[in-house]
C-alpha cells in the first residue's frame, strides 16, 4: 500500500474509486462518460451534488451552489468580475503564490488592487493579523489555506466589505459559517473530488450587480445560478465523482467528524516534528495548516538518506515546493490516520539512527 501525501489531485476513499469505476462501465445502462447531461439520471446527480454541498456546509437560504470548470485559476477572474462595483477597488490579503495570482487577475479586469496585509516579509510563513481594509473596497479576498507554504487562517478575517474566499485546499475539511461570505470558490481536486470541476457558493444578493464593462455570459455567475449549473455541458464525471465523495463524507459524520480526524492527524505529525531534533516546522505555530504540513531538516546533508528511507516505506508526494524546500505532507480528508503513523514511525526510526 502506498501512502499518498501529494498536494493534489487528492487522495479519495476507496469506496468512491470503486463506485466511480463501476459507473464508467455501467451507469444505468450507459457509461457515465457518455450519458447526456440533460438526461434525468445526470440531472439527479447534479441536484444531489448541490444538495449535499448545502447540507455538508449548512449553506443558508439566499445562496446558490454552482458547479463550473476552469479551476480556482478561472475563479480568480470570475470572482473579480462578478464582485466589481462602482469603486473598482479590491482589497487582497497576500499569503503567497495563490493570493498573488488572484491579485494579478483582478488587476487585469480593471480593479485597483489594494494589498491590505501580507506575510511576504518572512516568506509567507505566517498569517498576517493586522488587516486594514480600505472603506471604498468592493470586497476583501483571501486564500483560507496555503498549500505551498503550509499556513491556514484559523479565524476568518473580519471586514465591512463583502468577503470572498478561495477555499480550494480546505473546503469540507472543517466547519465554516457560510453566512460570513458573499462568495466562496474551490477547485475540486483537494478535498471534494477529481480535477475538472470547481465549486462556487455565492450569495444571491451579490448576483447581477457587477459594474464590469466586460463580463462574458459564461463568466457571469448569475447565468449559472439561473440554469442550475446546466448553462452548457458540465464536467459530468468530475461532478459525479464529487457527489460520491460528498455522500461518503456525510455517511461518515459530515464535516464536523472530518475536522476531528484532520486535527488528530495534524497533531500527530506536528508533535513529531516539534520533538524530533532532526526536523523543524516551516510555519509559525498559531498559523499551521492541518491540510498541508511543511517541515525542514535541521541537517540538510542527510536529505538523501531520509529521502531513501521514506520512499522505501512506500510514502509518496512528500517533496516540498521549491519556494519552501524540505518536505510537505498533504493530509486531505481521505488520507487515513495509519498513513500519518507510518510517516511518524519513519521519522522516529531516522532519528534513532543518529
Residue ranges of predicted features:
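Conserved PLP-binding catalytic core of the aspartate aminotransferase-like
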Residues: 279-309
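Conserved PLP-anchoring active-site segment centered on the Schiff-base-forming lysine
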Residues: 84-100
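Conserved active-site segment immediately N-terminal to the catalytic lysine
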Residues: 164, 178-189
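PLP-dependent enzyme catalytic core of the Aspartate aminotransferase-like
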Residues: 2, 328-354
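Active-site C-terminal subdomain of aminotransferase-like
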Residues: 188-270, 284, 353-354
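Active-site phosphate-binding strand-loop segment of PLP-dependent enzymes
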Residues: 106, 118-171
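Conserved N-terminal alpha-helix of the aminotransferase class I/II PLP-enzyme fold
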Residues: 29-75, 82, 97, 105
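A glycine-/small-polar-enriched, mobile loop at the entrance of the PLP active site in fold-type I
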Residues: 2-50
Amino acid at each position: 500500500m502506498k501512502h499518498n501525501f501529494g498536494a493534489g489531485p487528492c487522495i479519495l476513499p476507496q469506496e468512491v474509486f470503486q463506485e466511480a469505476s463501476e459507473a464508467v462501465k455501467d451507469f444505468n445502462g450507459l457509461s457515465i462518460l457518455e450519458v447526456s447531461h440533460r438526461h434525468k439520471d445526470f440531472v439527479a446527480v447534479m441536484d444531489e451534488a448541490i444538495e449535499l454541498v448545502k447540507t455538508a456546509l449548512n449553506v443558508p437560504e439566499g445562496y446558490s451552489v454552482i458547479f463550473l470548470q476552469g479551476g480556482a485559476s478561472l475563479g480568480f477572474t470570475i470572482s473579480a468580475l462578478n464582485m466589481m462595483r462602482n469603486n473598482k477597488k479590491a482589497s487582497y490579503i497576500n499569503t503567497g503564490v495563490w493570493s498573488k495570482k488572484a491579485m494579478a487577475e483582478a488587476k487585469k479586469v480593471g480593479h485597483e488592487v489594494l494589498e491590505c496585509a501580507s506575510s511576504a516579509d518572512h516568506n509567507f510563513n505566517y498569517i498576517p493579523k493586522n488587516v486594514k481594509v480600505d472603506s471604498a473596497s468592493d470586497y476583501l479576498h483571501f486564500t483560507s489555506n496555503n498549500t505551498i507554504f503550509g499556513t491556514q487562517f484559523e479565524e476568518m478575517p473580519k471586514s465591512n466589505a463583502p468577503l470572498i474566499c478561495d477555499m480550494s485546499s480546505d473546503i469540507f475539511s472543517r466547519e465554516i459559517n457560510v453566512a460570513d461570505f458573499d462568495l466562496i470558490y474551490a477547485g475540486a481536486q483537494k478535498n471534494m473530488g477529481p480535477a475538472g470541476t470547481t465549486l462556487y457558493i455565492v450569495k444571491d444578493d451579490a448576483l447581477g450587480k457587477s459594474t464590469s464593462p466586460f463580463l462574458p455570459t459564461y463568466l457571469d455567475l448569475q447565468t449559472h445560478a439561473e440554469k442550475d449549473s446546466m448553462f452548457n455541458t458540465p464536467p459530468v464525471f468530475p461532478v459525479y465523482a464529487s457527489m460520491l465523495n460528498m455522500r461518503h463524507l456525510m455517511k461518515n459524520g459530515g464535516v464536523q467528524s472530518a475536522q476531528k480526524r484532520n486535527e488528530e492527524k495534524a497533531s500527530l505529525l506536528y508533535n513529531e516534528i516539534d520533538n524530533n531534533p532532526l526536523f523543524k516546522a516551516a510555519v509559525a505555530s498559531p498559523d499551521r495548516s492541518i491540510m498541508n504540513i511543511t517541515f525542514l531538516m535541521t541537517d540538510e546533508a542527510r536529505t538523501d538518506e531520509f529521502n531513501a528511507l521514506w520512499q522505501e516505506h512506500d510514502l509518496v508526494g512528500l517533496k516540498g515546493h521549491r519556494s519552501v524546500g524540505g518536505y510537505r505532507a498533504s493530509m486531505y480528508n481521505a488520507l487515513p490516520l495509519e498513513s500519518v503513523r507510518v510517516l511518524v514511525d519513519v521519522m522516529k526510526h531516522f532519528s534513532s539512527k543518529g
